[in-house]
C-alpha cells in the first residue's frame, strides 16, 4: 500500500499525491511519521510562503472533501489536518499522539541522522491526554466510519 503523509501534502501543488482527496483506499495515511516534526512545530517553523500554501491547501481539501472545520488559527489548522486524515479514503489512518495533543517539536519522536538524546526517548505526560479527549477522537472516528 501507499504511504501518505499529510505533512507533505499542502505545498501548493494541486496534483500532490499526498492531498487527502487523492489518497487511494489501498494506502495508509499519517499526519506525520516518527521521523517528521509534529504538526504544531511544522507550522511554527514554516516560512510565510510555505504557511500560505499549507493554509490554502488545507482549506481547499476541506472544501473538496466536504469536511467540517476551518484553518483560521494554527490550532484549527491542526484539527483540520487531523479531520482530513479521518475523512480520506485510506484503509488506515495513523494519528501520532503528539499531533492529537497538539504538542510542539520538543515531543518529536526522532530526527534522522542525528544522535540527539531525545531520539526515541519521548514520553508524553498524562496531562496531555486530557487536552484532546477520547470523545473528540471518537466523534471523528464515528463521523468517518473508522
Enumerate the predicted regions with their spans:
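Catalytic cores of glycan-processing enzymes that make or break glycosidic bonds
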Residues: 1-146
Amino acid at each position: 500500500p501507499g504511504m501518505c503523509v499529510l505533512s507533505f501534502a499542502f505545498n501548493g501543488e494541486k496534483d500532490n499525491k499526498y492531498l487527502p482527496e487523492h489518497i487511494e483506499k489501498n494506502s495508509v495515511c499519517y499526519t506525520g511519521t516518527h521521523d517528521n516534526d509534529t504538526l504544531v512545530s511544522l507550522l511554527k517553523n514554516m516560512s510565510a510562503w510555505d504557511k500560505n500554501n499549507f493554509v490554502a491547501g488545507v482549506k481547499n481539501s476541506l472544501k473538496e472533501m466536504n469536511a467540517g472545520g476551518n484553518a483560521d488559527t494554527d490550532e484549527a489548522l491542526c484539527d483540520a489536518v487531523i479531520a482530513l486524515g479521518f475523512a480520506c479514503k485510506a484503509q488506515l489512518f495513523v494519528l501520532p499522539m503528539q499531533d492529537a495533543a497538539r504538542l510542539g517539536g520538543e515531543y518529536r519522536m526522532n530526527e534522522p541522522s542525528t544522535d540527539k538524546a531525545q531520539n526515541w526517548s519521548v514520553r508524553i505526560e498524562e496531562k496531555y491526554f486530557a487536552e484532546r479527549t477520547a470523545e473528540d477522537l471518537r466523534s471523528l472516528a464515528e463521523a468517518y466510519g473508522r
